[in-house]
């Protein structure tokens, strides 16, 4: 397994030497500046690749090995008028990446909103801060700020009472911050920042699309792109929904083991794989992460390793330290390592320590939400320690125990 680091480019304030010092060898990056639906050119890719891979004397090299993500446009997700054009641009971007030896591509199929949190600086018991999804605050946004048509039917009376109490206690600053957190697109999102009116309009464009319809559109997309990916040796890795359930009445179709099984059955192409994100899938108590990893091991080409802690009835959660929370990280790494040992060197699983607590010096710095250096470095070191220990006792390990 190869250790990677998500890098948002030189503007994000994380020098590549910091990545080296964290112990990573591979970079996960993307051309976030290119508008959704527009083709990535070879010149743009080469410029970013050279920036990453030009190695100063005496430094160890870094390799741009994973793209996260080429955005999938709303027209593709809705099978809209521009779907054919946007799929063509997506394929052209994939071909340009493959020509530059970047052959693992992460993407998602979440409509309107990408990954979603209500609180970007939840204070933990150590004084570090973490990201959190508070179900009641989310409901307050949906019911009283967004005022989504028909939202009431998605919440129980108890939920509605709690949401109103939270909303009535919020001042204007808190309301604006919640809008920013939910509607303005978190770092790495493949959806666009939205004003409240634009948010409502975008939701209306999905009014006639249920889960079965969205899944058909995903299958149509994969049927178009996987033959090209297979011919190029590219691996496509579908990221789970985050959180893995419906938001705003929208369908989500990559939330469970059954969801992925249906996708792989519909499009069994070798290039059709998954990004195994333990933090996203782990939010659901009914997702057995080791079982999912074991079942789909051959299709896992990229992994986000992080943990979450469910609160109350499980709909509220916060991001835990990497070896804490509700994720059996040791058990999962055992399965991934077992799979990785079966593979040729060029097909190794690439992973990154996903997200991280904001701690120590990072508490005083402007950081990319979810992606502070120190918290991610700590997580990567902890994961590396598990891998080193498991490798050392590999001959003694029985995966059936």
Curated annotation (Swiss-Prot):
Biological processes per GO annotation: D-glucuronate catabolic process
Pathway involvement of the protein, from the record: Carbohydrate metabolism; pentose and glucuronate interconversion
Pfam families the record matches: UxuA (PF03786)
Gene3D superfamilies attached to this UniProt entry: Divalent-metal-dependent TIM barrel enzymes
InterPro entries hit by this protein: Man_deHydtase, Xyl_isomerase-like_sf
Keyword field: Iron, Lyase, Manganese
GO function term, MF aspect, one: mannonate dehydratase activity
EC number(s) reported in the record: 4.2.1.8
Catalytic function, reaction form: D-mannonate = 2-dehydro-3-deoxy-D-gluconate + H2O
Cofactor(s) needed for function: Fe(2+); Mn(2+)
Keyword Iron recorded: yes
Enzyme class at the top of the EC tree: lyase
Family: Belongs to the mannonate dehydratase family.
Described purpose of this protein according to its UniProt entry: Catalyzes the dehydration of D-mannonate.
Name recorded for this polypeptide: Mannonate dehydratase
The organism of origin for this protein: Brucella canis (strain ATCC 23365 / NCTC 10854 / RM-666)
Gene it is expressed from: uxuA
């Amino acid at each position: 397994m190869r250790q990677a680091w998500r890098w948002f480019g030189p503007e994000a304030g994380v020098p590549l030497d910091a990545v080296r010092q964290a112990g990573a060898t591979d970079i996960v990056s993307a051309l976030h500046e290119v508008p959704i639906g527009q083709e990535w050119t070879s010149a743009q890719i080469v410029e970013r690749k050279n920036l990453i891979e030009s190695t100063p004397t005496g430094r160890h090299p870094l390799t741009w090995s994973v793209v996260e993500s080429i955005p999938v446009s709303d027209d593709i997700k809705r099978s809209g008028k521009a779907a054919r054009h946007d799929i063509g641009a997506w394929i052209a971007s994939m071909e340009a990446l493959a020509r530059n030896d970047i052959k693992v591509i992460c993407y998602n199929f979440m409509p309107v909103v990408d990954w979603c949190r209500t609180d970007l600086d939840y204070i933990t018991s150590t004084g570090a801060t973490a990201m959190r999804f508070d179900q009641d605050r989310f409901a307050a946004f949906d019911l009283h700020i967004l005022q989504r048509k028909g939202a009431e039917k998605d919440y129980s009376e108890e939920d509605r009472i709690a949401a109103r109490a939270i909303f009535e206690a919020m001042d204007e600053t808190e309301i604006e911050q919640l809008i920013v957190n939910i509607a303005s697109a978190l770092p790495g999102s493949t959806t666009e920042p939205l004003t409240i009116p634009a948010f409502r309009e975008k939701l209306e464009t999905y009014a006639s699309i249920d889960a079965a319809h969205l899944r058909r559109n995903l299958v149509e997309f994969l049927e178009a792109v996987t033959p090209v990916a297979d011919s190029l040796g590219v691996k496509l890795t579908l990221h789970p929904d985050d959180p893995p359930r419906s938001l705003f009445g929208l369908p989500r179709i990559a939330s469970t083991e059954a969801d992925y099984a249906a996708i792989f059955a519909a499009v069994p192409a070798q290039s059709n794989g998954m990004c195994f994100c333990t933090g996203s899938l782990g939010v659901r108590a009914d997702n057995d992460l080791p079982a999912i990893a074991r079942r789909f091991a051959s299709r896992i080409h990229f992994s986000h390793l992080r943990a979450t802690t469910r609160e109350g009835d499980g709909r509220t959660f916060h991001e835990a330290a990497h070896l804490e929370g509700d994720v059996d990280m040791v058990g999962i790494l055992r399965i991934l390592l077992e799979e990785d040992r079966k593979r040729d060197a060029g097909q190794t699983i690439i992973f990154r320590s996903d997200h991280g607590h904001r701690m120590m010096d990072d508490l005083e710095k402007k950081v990319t939400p979810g992606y502070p250096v120190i918290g991610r470095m700590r997580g990567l070191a902890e994961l590396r320690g598990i891998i080193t220990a498991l490798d050392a006792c590999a001959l003694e390990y029985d995966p059936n125990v």
